[in-house]
Amino acid sequence: WNVYTDDVKDSVASYGDAAIVVLSRIGGEGADLDFKETNYLALDDNEKEMLQNVAEMKKAGQVKKIVVLINSANTLQVDFLKNNEYDVDACMWIGDVGISGINAVAEILAGNVTPSGSLVDTYLYDNFSAPAMMNFVPTVYEGYEEGIIPEHAKTYMIYQEGIYVGYKYYETRYEDYVMQSGNSGAYEYHDDVAYPFGYGMSYTDFKY
């Protein structure tokens, strides 16, 4: 929060309507996520501090709403959306917007068009609740020689879970519990899943 100048902070307060908070992560084809000791897809301390300060501005009446935009092709851990300390009113996944996609985001925020898409991934309270995370480590190829193979091409991963990665695991795990298949045991779906695959809201209510 300290990296922002007073002019930036004052501009939010003088606007007074909605504070737009953008959370970004980098990762995709040919550029895997950062292997940190912490959870790269969770909020870091700087982001938490920023949301806390914006929430204080809202509490003081300087802004009316807090809207979070998730600028990432990967699924952030969204436990913060249910944290009253941050008091977030709305969140929209915008993916990697490219050169002109941000114009469409502005149209949505202004209410000129209505968002009607549904999530293509499952968003979790804790990304490490997935069994696949147990194998998410960079394994170096046997016989790898420094200077021969590019650094980014020296490692691989093993998917021991087969198809049960991401939403396929959570949906199947829950179905096994409901149907009492095998040794499924107890399972609380909503303790893991914040927003399921296919979830989506709009400015409009539809009747069928």
Summary of predicted features, one role per range:
Residues 1-207:
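C-terminal non-catalytic regions of proteins with extracellular/luminal or membrane-system context
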